[in-house]
Amino acid sequence: MTDTVNTRRLALDVLLEVTEHGAYSNQVLRAVLEKYQYMEKYERAFLTRLVEGTIQHMIELDYVIDQFSKVKVKKMKPVIRNILRMGVYQICLLYTSPSPRDS
């Protein structure tokens, strides 16, 4: 079985569970990694780094987003807010991408 999965979408789902529903990131992330065991090792590592890094740097990421957005982070829809957080984290703090096909 060669199912393809969008790791960024999975990261977004984890972040939404954590930020909007108060779930524990390690538990949600573990459940996702168990569900998608067929993912390549580099994809699993990227997913973990993206989720953990975005959560770890959330205050700084929100500050950067607020500097460039007309809409303040706190007023954004949760999906938009977390997509922007992940994007800023990748651009500013994460130096590698898992694969060109996951862009």
Enumerate the predicted regions with their spans:
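N-terminal interaction/assembly modules
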Residues: 1-72, 79, 88-91
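Single conserved hydrophobic/aromatic residue that forms the stacking wall/gate
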Residues: 95-103
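Short, well-structured alpha-helical patches and their helix-loop capping segments
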Residues: 76-80, 97
